[in-house]
Curated annotation (Swiss-Prot):
Signal peptide: none annotated. One of its GO terms (molecular function) is tRNA pseudouridine(55) synthase activity. The active site is at D40. Keywords: Isomerase, tRNA processing. Coiled coil: none annotated. Pfam families: TruB_C_2, TruB_N. This is tRNA pseudouridine synthase B.
Amino acid sequence: MDMTGILPLAKPRGMTSHDCVAKLRRLLKTKKVGHTGTLDPDVYGVLPVCIGHATKVAQYMSDYPKAYEGEVTVGFSTTTEDRSGDTVETKTIQQPFVEAVVDQVLATFVGEIKQIPPMYSAVKVRGKRLYEYARAGITVERPERTVTIFSLERMSDIVYEEGVCRFRFNVSCSKGTYVRTLAVDIGKALGYPAHMSDLVRTKSGPFSLEECFTFTELEERLEQGEGSSLLLPIETAILDIPRVQVNKEIEEKIRHGAVLPQKWFNHPRFTVYNEEGALLAIYKAHPSKDGFVKPEKMLANDQQ
């Protein structure tokens, strides 16, 4: 069974993104499986996975904006910035926050913000991932990064118990945003240590949690011989790239990987479809021939 397409997977808690890829390779009996952005093991939610020839477009999916539903616990911080870590600092909440003040604090994070990646993260510093240093008990200086918070809103009451409080929030953000770190920074802005106590990724680019499938659902469909029915077309993943439709004459040139004049297309990068609406290729500006475009990915069926 030749399976090609995008599988919108609902990643279960307790599995790494790599675990999911390994399991899918076994289930689908193919090595051509690739995920498009790491989700922490404790996080449940949207993980778009490229199957078969769809792995060719994985690189275009890593820049997707993301959306999450999370929970911040205010009153103590942890080594990992989430609930899996050891407690680092505690500070008892003596009196309830004014909800309007909390909402005002959240509003201050909307827009471009600076973040320092957590020590327990996959960011590389001097050739090693930060979590490798962290596990060895070494703290290293981490490069600050700029990310964008498109929206951030509290979506539950603030619940108090035993000197801490927690509330749920929705956040929409650019790629590379650490929501754990955001939770810690929200606590700092309120004057308390804090950590992220729960997280669900609800959206990744055009893929939302409502349309994702669990491993159980996938296994059931495979048993019925209908596994490919869960896959979305490759073009679903690259809808944000400008689209150009070409006639039969230009289609023939594109199928042969021709370098073409950019003035025909007016885009530095674009997807190419034929008159029947079939995806042929992704083209980009030629790096050395000014005024021309060249194929970046050949995606026509007979090229696969």
